[in-house]
Amino acid sequence: MRSKVEILPSNLIFHELIGLEIKVINSTNPSLTGIRGRVINETKNMLVVENSQSRELKIPKADSEFLFRIPAELSEKGRRSDTFVKIQGNLLLSQPENRIKNIKKLRKWG
């Protein structure tokens, strides 16, 4: 099912992240760098990622850098391949529902 608002690199930080594939590409905790999996939960300060061994890992948003994969079917119309977006975790520090509300405000005024 397509979302009403397409997920673009420019608006990813306002979207629901649960279900997206992710890789930690940098972190102040070196043991977190390189972790990859699917986001299964999100809090104000953490992303919970399920890795390929079905293990749940809690990753702090602050001081981490992530690479998200946006599947082609959720991305721009006509796009035939997945899009990869690098995001500083500090930009995600907010309760998910508040971040999602902000895109609705932007659309209203944009």
UniProtKB/Swiss-Prot annotation:
Quaternary form?
Answer: Consists of a catalytic RNA component and at least 4-5 protein subunits.
Is Nuclease included in the keywords of this UniProt record?
yes
Principal localization reads cytoplasm
State the function annotated in the UniProt record.
Part of ribonuclease P, a protein complex that generates mature tRNA molecules by cleaving their 5'-ends.
Q: What family is this protein classified in?
A: Belongs to the eukaryotic/archaeal RNase P protein component 1 family.
Q: Which SUPFAM superfamilies match?
A: Rof/RNase P subunit-like (SSF101744)
Q: Which reaction does it catalyse?
A: Endonucleolytic cleavage of RNA, removing 5'-extranucleotides from tRNA precursor
Which InterPro entries does the entry mention?
RNase_P/MRP_Rpp29_sf, RNP1, Rof/RNase_P-like, Rpp29/RNP1
According to its UniProt record, the EC number is: 3.1.26.5
Q: What is this protein called?
A: Ribonuclease P protein component 1
For the keyword Thylakoid, the answer is no
GO molecular function terms here? ribonuclease P activity; RNA binding
